[in-house]
Amino acid sequence: MIKIKNKTLSGNINAVQSKSMAHRYIICSALSKEYTKIYLKDISQDVKATIDAIKNLGTDVDIRDDYIIIRESNIKNNIFDCKQSGTTLRFMLPIATSLLDECSFIGHGRLPKRPINDIVNIMKKSSCIFSNDTLPFNIKNKFIC
């Protein structure tokens, strides 16, 4: 069991190279509002979609050869292009709608056909208004957990 105390953390960790974990590290770093350096040898198209999405939330991302730097910036855009990444869509949908009053999500390839009814229904119960049940859609009202 890991116990986390409420205090400022700093230092370096060696993280497993995993696309799934890369999404999580990038999103958590963006939400922390702290300067973060994440070592990634390869950036997949799915992870690139998450990087683009957090830029829309007002995060500056500097991509280097084997790492990325994430730091706070200003909100730039409320349109989230998840490309073909289901992970980006599932992670960013509740995050973006809890931070923004209105936003739009789009996707490509098979992503618009992938099921997300569970997330959409939960968000609708929280007063989010969706223009469609499948991508692309606009969402009004903040998601309140």
Task: Give the ranges of each region predicted by the language model.
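Structural preference for solvent-exposed beta-strand-turn elements
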Residues: 1-145
